[in-house]
Curated annotation (Swiss-Prot):
Enzyme Commission number, as recorded: 2.4.2.1, 3.5.4.4, 2.4.2.28
UniProt-listed CDD domains: YfiH
Cofactor: Cu(2+); Zn(2+)
Pfam families: Cu-oxidase_4
Its biological purpose: Purine nucleoside enzyme that catalyzes the phosphorolysis of adenosine and inosine nucleosides, yielding D-ribose 1-phosphate and the respective free bases, adenine and hypoxanthine. Also catalyzes the phosphorolysis of S-methyl-5'-thioadenosine into adenine and S-methyl-5-thio-alpha-D-ribose 1-phosphate. Also has adenosine deaminase activity.
Keywords from the UniProt entry: Copper, Hydrolase, Metal-binding, Oxidoreductase, Transferase, Zinc
Assembly: Homodimer.
Keyword Chaperone in record: no
InterPro entries: Cu_polyphenol_OxRdtase, Cu_polyphenol_OxRdtase_sf, Cytotoxic_necrot_fac-like_cat
Name by which UniProt lists this protein: Purine nucleoside phosphorylase aq_167
Family under the similarity heading: Belongs to the purine nucleoside phosphorylase YfiH/LACC1 family.
NCBIfam families in the record: peptidoglycan editing factor PgeF
Higher taxonomy: Bacteria, Pseudomonadati, Aquificota, Aquificia, Aquificales
Length: 206
């Protein structure tokens, strides 16, 4: 399942999607939000949050079944992914290193170990193949989603993330096909070397 009729322009910077008792948000990160955010290091570590008072840990994905506890990840070109199960939810920061290390598969495995076998994935804007120039070494890391143009190599991490979701049995996937690099309203480290980030988060409501 795909959905691409997401808002454009400034409206895209304050998006909320309610799915049942779950609320997903995509907005500019201010640093004042009361949200559980992992210490992101481009790893394949998945944090299972079972205590709302737990301090931030190093990792690039979080899963939880706690009610009214918002979890999220920060991105500015990497792929932000929200995973929705019946009782558990997850937030994933998938840069090219995380995609190479299998962060998506490991997060899905953690959710399935908690009994989640019907998961919906929401994939939000990231750098895409139109703009994301990479080195030739990427041919060693990824066998697909690479294109050469004018002697340069480009990689599409969002498409790679979607294909990894499919390979791990996820059939319900909503994709916001937007490139952060060529969308000036969205923060892009590659374009601006900015410290700004987008915050993609999810909360299970009572």
């Amino acid at each position: 399942m795909y959905k691409q009729d997401f808002p454009e322009g400034k409206e895209a910077l304050n998006l909320e999607i309610r799915l049942g008792n779950k609320l997903v948000r995509f907005r500019k990160f201010t640093g004042k939000e009361k949200i559980y955010l992992p210490i992101q290091r481009h790893t394949d570590k998945v944090i299972k949050l079972i205590d709302k008072d737990s301090p931030p840990l190093e990792g690039d994905a979080v899963i939880t079944n706690l009610k009214n506890v918002e979890i999220g990840v920060r991105t500015a070109d990497c792929v932000p992914i929200i995973l929705l199960g019946k009782e558990w939810v997850g937030a994933v920061h998938a840069g090219w290193r995380g995609l190479k290390k299998g962060i998506i598969a490991k997060t899905l495995k953690a959710l399935k170990e908690e009994g989640e076998d019907d998961i919906t994935a929401l994939v939000f804007p990231s750098a895409k193949g139109c703009c994301y120039e990479v080195g030739k070494e990427f041919k060693e890391f990824f066998r697909r989603n690479l294109k050469e143009r004018n002697g340069k190599l480009f990689f599409d991490p969002q498409r790679e993330a979607v294909e990894q979701l499919r390979e791990n049995g996820i059939k319900s996937i909503l994709v916001w096909e937007k490139c952060t690099i060529c969308s000036p309203e969205l923060p892009s480290y590659r374009r601006d070397k900015t410290k700004e980030r987008m915050l993609t988060s999810v909360v299970i409501l009572f």
